[in-house]
Amino acid sequence: MGSPNSLFEVESFLKNMFNDPLILGIKNTFARKMLASFITHSRVEETKKNYQAIGGKSPLTAHTLNLTNKLNELDCKRFYTYAMRYTPPFAYQVLEDIKTQGIQSVVLFSLYPQFSYSTIASSLIDAKAALQKLAFTPTLYEISSYHTHPDYISCIIERIKESLGADNPNEFVLLLSAHSLPQSRIDEGDPYQKQCEENKEVIQKALESEGIVFKKIALAYQSKVGRMKWIGPSTKETITKYKKHKMIIFPLSFTLDNSETEYELKILYASLAKELNVPQYRVCSCFNDNERFAKSIMNILEEHLRGKAEV
Protein backbone atom coordinates (compact mmCIF):
# COMPACT_ATOMS: atom_id res chain seq x y z
CA MET A 1 0.00 0.00 0.00
CA GLY A 2 2.97 2.30 0.53
CA SER A 3 4.29 4.50 3.32
CA PRO A 4 5.83 7.96 3.51
CA ASN A 5 9.46 8.16 2.40
CA SER A 6 9.87 11.41 4.33
CA LEU A 7 7.88 13.62 6.69
CA PHE A 8 6.94 15.73 3.66
CA GLU A 9 5.05 12.76 2.18
CA VAL A 10 2.93 12.08 5.28
CA GLU A 11 0.10 14.43 4.31
CA SER A 12 -0.19 13.21 0.71
CA PHE A 13 -0.01 9.60 1.92
CA LEU A 14 -2.92 10.14 4.30
CA LYS A 15 -4.97 12.02 1.68
CA ASN A 16 -4.45 9.31 -0.91
CA MET A 17 -5.31 6.56 1.55
CA PHE A 18 -8.46 8.09 2.98
CA ASN A 19 -9.65 9.16 -0.49
CA ASP A 20 -9.67 5.51 -1.60
CA PRO A 21 -13.34 4.41 -1.88
CA LEU A 22 -12.38 0.95 -0.59
CA ILE A 23 -10.92 2.48 2.59
CA LEU A 24 -13.75 4.80 3.65
CA GLY A 25 -16.50 3.04 1.69
CA ILE A 26 -18.01 6.32 0.43
CA LYS A 27 -18.97 6.24 -3.26
CA ASN A 28 -19.72 9.96 -3.62
CA THR A 29 -16.41 11.49 -4.74
CA PHE A 30 -17.05 14.97 -3.31
CA ALA A 31 -18.17 13.67 0.09
CA ARG A 32 -15.24 11.25 0.24
CA LYS A 33 -12.70 13.98 -0.59
CA MET A 34 -14.16 16.26 2.06
CA LEU A 35 -14.01 13.57 4.73
CA ALA A 36 -10.53 12.48 3.61
CA SER A 37 -9.34 16.07 3.94
CA PHE A 38 -10.84 16.35 7.43
CA ILE A 39 -9.31 13.07 8.64
CA THR A 40 -5.93 13.97 7.15
CA HIS A 41 -5.94 17.38 8.82
CA SER A 42 -6.83 15.85 12.20
CA ARG A 43 -4.18 13.11 12.01
CA VAL A 44 -1.24 14.56 10.10
CA GLU A 45 0.76 16.04 13.01
CA GLU A 46 0.37 12.99 15.25
CA THR A 47 1.32 10.73 12.34
CA LYS A 48 4.43 12.82 11.65
CA LYS A 49 5.49 12.39 15.29
CA ASN A 50 5.15 8.63 14.95
CA TYR A 51 7.38 8.63 11.87
CA GLN A 52 9.87 10.93 13.59
CA ALA A 53 10.20 8.25 16.29
CA ILE A 54 11.39 5.73 13.66
CA GLY A 55 13.79 8.01 11.81
CA GLY A 56 11.50 10.36 9.88
CA LYS A 57 10.28 7.86 7.29
CA SER A 58 8.92 4.38 6.86
CA PRO A 59 11.43 1.59 6.18
CA LEU A 60 8.91 -0.06 3.84
CA THR A 61 10.23 1.28 0.53
CA ALA A 62 13.83 0.32 1.31
CA HIS A 63 12.78 -3.19 2.38
CA THR A 64 10.65 -3.60 -0.75
CA LEU A 65 13.50 -2.48 -3.01
CA ASN A 66 15.91 -4.84 -1.25
CA LEU A 67 13.45 -7.72 -1.66
CA THR A 68 13.01 -7.11 -5.39
CA ASN A 69 16.79 -6.89 -5.77
CA LYS A 70 17.12 -10.22 -3.96
CA LEU A 71 14.49 -11.79 -6.22
CA ASN A 72 16.25 -10.51 -9.34
CA GLU A 73 19.52 -12.00 -8.06
CA LEU A 74 17.91 -15.40 -7.41
CA ASP A 75 15.70 -15.63 -10.50
CA CYS A 76 17.24 -14.55 -13.80
CA LYS A 77 14.19 -15.79 -15.75
CA ARG A 78 12.00 -12.90 -14.63
CA PHE A 79 12.10 -9.20 -13.89
CA TYR A 80 10.85 -8.26 -10.41
CA THR A 81 9.76 -4.74 -9.55
CA TYR A 82 7.23 -3.15 -7.19
CA ALA A 83 4.50 -0.54 -6.97
CA MET A 84 2.80 1.18 -4.05
CA ARG A 85 -0.82 2.26 -3.70
CA TYR A 86 -0.59 5.61 -1.91
CA THR A 87 3.05 6.71 -2.33
CA PRO A 88 5.54 6.50 -5.21
CA PRO A 89 6.30 4.45 -7.19
CA PHE A 90 2.67 4.22 -8.30
CA ALA A 91 1.29 1.41 -10.45
CA TYR A 92 0.95 3.65 -13.52
CA GLN A 93 4.64 4.62 -13.45
CA VAL A 94 5.82 1.05 -12.92
CA LEU A 95 3.56 -0.48 -15.57
CA GLU A 96 4.53 2.23 -18.05
CA ASP A 97 8.17 1.22 -17.57
CA ILE A 98 7.27 -2.46 -17.97
CA LYS A 99 5.42 -1.67 -21.21
CA THR A 100 8.42 0.29 -22.51
CA GLN A 101 10.63 -2.75 -21.87
CA GLY A 102 8.40 -4.84 -24.11
CA ILE A 103 7.37 -7.26 -21.37
CA GLN A 104 4.22 -9.16 -22.35
CA SER A 105 3.38 -11.14 -19.21
CA VAL A 106 2.70 -9.54 -15.81
CA VAL A 107 2.03 -11.15 -12.43
CA LEU A 108 0.45 -8.94 -9.77
CA PHE A 109 1.75 -10.43 -6.50
CA SER A 110 0.51 -9.04 -3.19
CA LEU A 111 2.92 -8.75 -0.29
CA TYR A 112 -0.08 -9.06 2.03
CA PRO A 113 -0.58 -12.81 2.66
CA GLN A 114 -4.27 -12.49 3.60
CA PHE A 115 -6.82 -11.09 1.14
CA SER A 116 -8.82 -7.98 1.98
CA TYR A 117 -10.89 -5.72 -0.24
CA SER A 118 -9.42 -2.67 1.52
CA THR A 119 -5.84 -3.57 0.64
CA ILE A 120 -5.39 -6.16 -2.10
CA ALA A 121 -8.58 -5.51 -4.08
CA SER A 122 -7.84 -1.78 -3.99
CA SER A 123 -4.33 -2.35 -5.35
CA LEU A 124 -5.54 -4.72 -8.07
CA ILE A 125 -8.19 -2.24 -9.21
CA ASP A 126 -5.56 0.50 -9.29
CA ALA A 127 -3.16 -1.61 -11.35
CA LYS A 128 -5.85 -2.64 -13.83
CA ALA A 129 -6.96 0.97 -14.23
CA ALA A 130 -3.34 1.90 -14.99
CA LEU A 131 -3.12 -0.86 -17.61
CA GLN A 132 -6.26 0.47 -19.27
CA LYS A 133 -4.95 4.05 -19.35
CA LEU A 134 -1.69 2.82 -20.85
CA ALA A 135 -3.53 0.67 -23.43
CA PHE A 136 -1.25 -2.11 -22.19
CA THR A 137 -2.69 -5.61 -22.53
CA PRO A 138 -0.13 -8.14 -21.26
CA THR A 139 -1.00 -11.67 -20.24
CA LEU A 140 -2.08 -10.94 -16.67
CA TYR A 141 -1.99 -13.12 -13.56
CA GLU A 142 -2.71 -12.21 -9.95
CA ILE A 143 -1.71 -13.82 -6.67
CA SER A 144 -3.79 -12.29 -3.93
CA SER A 145 -3.62 -14.78 -1.05
CA TYR A 146 -1.15 -17.36 0.24
CA HIS A 147 -1.79 -17.30 3.98
CA THR A 148 -1.64 -21.09 4.38
CA HIS A 149 1.05 -21.90 1.82
CA PRO A 150 3.69 -24.21 3.37
CA ASP A 151 6.65 -22.12 2.17
CA TYR A 152 5.18 -18.94 3.66
CA ILE A 153 4.37 -20.77 6.91
CA SER A 154 7.95 -22.09 7.11
CA CYS A 155 9.20 -18.49 6.97
CA ILE A 156 6.97 -17.62 9.93
CA ILE A 157 8.17 -20.63 11.93
CA GLU A 158 11.78 -19.64 11.26
CA ARG A 159 11.20 -16.11 12.58
CA ILE A 160 9.39 -17.36 15.70
CA LYS A 161 12.17 -19.86 16.44
CA GLU A 162 14.78 -17.11 16.04
CA SER A 163 12.94 -14.97 18.60
CA LEU A 164 12.44 -17.88 20.98
CA GLY A 165 16.05 -19.03 20.83
CA ALA A 166 16.87 -21.77 23.34
CA ASP A 167 14.10 -20.72 25.74
CA ASN A 168 11.15 -22.91 26.73
CA PRO A 169 8.12 -22.03 24.55
CA ASN A 170 5.78 -23.17 27.33
CA GLU A 171 6.85 -20.10 29.29
CA PHE A 172 5.71 -17.74 26.50
CA VAL A 173 2.49 -16.45 25.02
CA LEU A 174 2.80 -16.14 21.24
CA LEU A 175 0.74 -13.16 20.09
CA LEU A 176 -0.03 -12.97 16.37
CA SER A 177 -0.79 -9.30 15.73
CA ALA A 178 -2.64 -8.49 12.50
CA HIS A 179 -3.80 -5.16 11.11
CA SER A 180 -7.41 -4.57 12.10
CA LEU A 181 -10.40 -3.77 9.87
CA PRO A 182 -13.79 -2.19 10.59
CA GLN A 183 -16.30 -4.84 11.66
CA SER A 184 -18.65 -3.56 8.95
CA ARG A 185 -16.21 -4.74 6.26
CA ILE A 186 -16.23 -8.26 7.67
CA ASP A 187 -20.04 -8.18 7.90
CA GLU A 188 -20.12 -7.24 4.19
CA GLY A 189 -18.16 -10.38 3.32
CA ASP A 190 -14.48 -9.45 3.46
CA PRO A 191 -12.61 -12.76 4.06
CA TYR A 192 -9.68 -11.13 5.88
CA GLN A 193 -10.54 -12.12 9.46
CA LYS A 194 -11.33 -15.70 8.45
CA GLN A 195 -7.99 -15.95 6.64
CA CYS A 196 -6.15 -14.57 9.69
CA GLU A 197 -7.81 -17.24 11.83
CA GLU A 198 -6.89 -19.94 9.29
CA ASN A 199 -3.34 -18.57 9.29
CA LYS A 200 -3.18 -18.93 13.09
CA GLU A 201 -4.38 -22.55 12.99
CA VAL A 202 -1.80 -23.56 10.39
CA ILE A 203 1.00 -21.83 12.33
CA GLN A 204 -0.02 -23.63 15.54
CA LYS A 205 -0.03 -27.03 13.80
CA ALA A 206 3.34 -26.35 12.17
CA LEU A 207 4.89 -25.38 15.51
CA GLU A 208 3.43 -28.41 17.28
CA SER A 209 4.75 -30.70 14.52
CA GLU A 210 8.23 -29.52 15.55
CA GLY A 211 7.50 -30.03 19.24
CA ILE A 212 7.15 -26.29 19.91
CA VAL A 213 4.19 -25.75 22.24
CA PHE A 214 3.53 -22.26 23.59
CA LYS A 215 1.59 -21.54 26.76
CA LYS A 216 -0.94 -19.81 24.52
CA ILE A 217 -1.16 -18.69 20.90
CA ALA A 218 -3.43 -15.66 20.60
CA LEU A 219 -4.63 -13.67 17.60
CA ALA A 220 -5.17 -9.93 18.05
CA TYR A 221 -5.58 -6.84 15.88
CA GLN A 222 -3.76 -3.51 15.84
CA SER A 223 -3.92 -0.07 14.18
CA LYS A 224 -7.57 0.80 14.77
CA VAL A 225 -8.55 4.29 13.57
CA GLY A 226 -11.64 6.27 14.61
CA ARG A 227 -14.65 5.44 16.76
CA MET A 228 -16.43 2.75 14.74
CA LYS A 229 -16.30 -0.89 15.80
CA TRP A 230 -13.26 -2.77 14.52
CA ILE A 231 -12.49 -6.48 14.71
CA GLY A 232 -10.80 -7.62 17.88
CA PRO A 233 -9.55 -8.33 20.40
CA SER A 234 -7.05 -5.51 20.10
CA THR A 235 -3.34 -6.05 20.51
CA LYS A 236 -3.35 -3.62 23.43
CA GLU A 237 -6.11 -5.56 25.22
CA THR A 238 -4.34 -8.86 24.61
CA ILE A 239 -0.99 -7.65 25.92
CA THR A 240 -2.80 -6.43 29.02
CA LYS A 241 -4.64 -9.75 29.39
CA TYR A 242 -1.41 -11.78 29.34
CA LYS A 243 0.76 -9.24 31.15
CA LYS A 244 2.01 -11.80 33.69
CA HIS A 245 3.56 -13.95 30.97
CA LYS A 246 6.62 -13.70 28.77
CA MET A 247 5.53 -12.69 25.30
CA ILE A 248 6.62 -13.04 21.67
CA ILE A 249 4.84 -10.88 19.10
CA PHE A 250 4.68 -11.91 15.45
CA PRO A 251 3.31 -9.33 12.93
CA LEU A 252 0.90 -11.63 11.10
CA SER A 253 -0.35 -9.43 8.28
CA PHE A 254 2.99 -7.91 7.28
CA THR A 255 5.86 -9.45 5.33
CA LEU A 256 7.96 -6.26 5.38
CA ASP A 257 8.72 -4.03 8.36
CA ASN A 258 6.87 -0.70 8.34
CA SER A 259 5.52 1.89 10.76
CA GLU A 260 3.02 -0.59 12.22
CA THR A 261 5.86 -2.92 13.22
CA GLU A 262 8.62 -0.41 13.95
CA TYR A 263 6.50 2.15 15.82
CA GLU A 264 3.38 0.36 17.10
CA LEU A 265 4.87 -2.99 18.06
CA LYS A 266 8.47 -2.07 18.87
CA ILE A 267 7.89 1.33 20.52
CA LEU A 268 4.24 1.95 21.49
CA TYR A 269 3.35 -1.55 22.71
CA ALA A 270 6.84 -2.19 24.04
CA SER A 271 6.30 0.85 26.26
CA LEU A 272 2.93 -0.55 27.34
CA ALA A 273 4.54 -3.91 28.15
CA LYS A 274 7.14 -2.13 30.27
CA GLU A 275 4.43 -0.23 32.16
CA LEU A 276 2.59 -3.50 32.78
CA ASN A 277 5.78 -5.25 33.93
CA VAL A 278 5.52 -7.94 31.25
CA PRO A 279 8.46 -10.25 32.13
CA GLN A 280 9.77 -10.36 28.56
CA TYR A 281 8.47 -8.68 25.41
CA ARG A 282 9.97 -9.71 22.08
CA VAL A 283 8.90 -8.68 18.57
CA CYS A 284 9.78 -10.84 15.58
CA SER A 285 11.15 -8.96 12.61
CA CYS A 286 9.29 -9.27 9.32
CA PHE A 287 10.88 -11.24 6.50
CA ASN A 288 12.09 -8.20 4.53
CA ASP A 289 14.74 -9.40 2.03
CA ASN A 290 15.30 -12.74 3.78
CA GLU A 291 16.40 -15.28 1.16
CA ARG A 292 14.03 -17.95 2.40
CA PHE A 293 11.09 -15.58 1.95
CA ALA A 294 12.30 -14.56 -1.52
CA LYS A 295 12.47 -18.23 -2.50
CA SER A 296 8.99 -18.81 -1.09
CA ILE A 297 7.68 -16.04 -3.37
CA MET A 298 9.37 -17.74 -6.33
CA ASN A 299 7.83 -21.10 -5.40
CA ILE A 300 4.34 -19.65 -4.92
CA LEU A 301 4.70 -17.87 -8.26
CA GLU A 302 5.85 -21.02 -10.07
CA GLU A 303 3.00 -23.09 -8.63
CA HIS A 304 0.45 -20.44 -9.58
CA LEU A 305 1.68 -20.14 -13.16
CA ARG A 306 1.67 -23.91 -13.60
CA GLY A 307 -1.86 -24.29 -12.31
CA LYS A 308 -3.74 -21.14 -13.23
CA ALA A 309 -5.00 -19.45 -16.38
CA GLU A 310 -4.52 -15.75 -17.01
CA VAL A 311 -6.95 -13.21 -15.52
UniProtKB/Swiss-Prot annotation:
Fe cation binds at H179, E260. The keyword GTP-binding does not apply. The keyword Metal-binding applies. GO terms for cellular component: cytoplasm. It is found in: Cytoplasm. Pathway: Porphyrin-containing compound metabolism; protoheme biosynthesis; protoheme from protoporphyrin-IX: step 1/1. This is Ferrochelatase. It comes from Helicobacter hepaticus (strain ATCC 51449 / 3B1).
